[in-house]
Amino acid sequence: MNTIAPALKQIASGLRFPEGPVAMDDGSVILVEIERQTLSRVTPDGKVQVIATLGGGPNGAAMGPGGKIYVTNNGGLKFMVRPGKMFPIGQADDYTRGSIQIVEPLTGKFETLYDACDGQRLRGPNDLVFDRAGGFWFTDLGKTRDRDMDRGAVYYAKADGSMIREAIFPLERPNGIGLSPDERTLYVVETPTARCWAFRLSAPGQIESAKSVFRGDRGTLVAGLGGYQMFDSLAVDGEGHVCVATPITGAVTDVWPDGSRVDQYKLPDMMVTNVCFGGRALRTAFATLSMGGTLVSFEWPRPGLALNHLNKK
């Protein structure tokens, strides 16, 4: 494994556990602040503007149809706060359920699109990605309590609210999710195992059966990290590399599509939680450093992958 220390630019500070960055064409970055319960916009000069106060625990964000922002809301987290740092320690005391929300970024108006599937409450939706067919995949990491935790799942849903179904269950706290450039492979990472799984798709929203030593419907292991490391949210770049925020280590892990090589870009915060691509030719990586509450950027060695509804032409 190669370890790289990139030259960083700090864009904003004072964020309340930022996650879910979306790099906009105007140079701003829309993100969530989980502890603050908001969807916020960070301008290029570092100013932070609240778009909407969503309640619960807004966790991930993606641009969807019609210029609206789709948010995975985990329902709320309890935080331990110390001078200059914060980190989640479990389910919020006022938690009820998770949901998928739609936000109109110009007005801040929002609505709940989904909060259950086949009679089962969504527990803790975490990350999402849109496909070109009009649907989106999202992970439900579940919730952690003092003595027990939920089992995680992956769902596929239509953006208009007409359909949601469970696609993969169970997983060990699934977090980041993304599609390969040809949209024939779905990538999902698990937080505690620091494993990246690949699932072949036979059609939009349909997982092809795969053989695996561990579990047939779980897909193929692309990479797993050794030692005490975790995987959080991810982005896929233009060459199909899976770029995964890596807490504990405090890095963005660059996984080759075939798993043959793994590099790590070390960042100055042990809670690196998400990454996205923007800027000229999508060569700028934006990362949320959540424990210290900062948004930083650095140059990525390859262009990022253009996203449906955002910058895909």
Question: Which residues does each PLM region occupy?
Answer:
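Sequence-structural signature of mature extracellular/luminal beta-sheet repeat domains
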Residues: 1-313
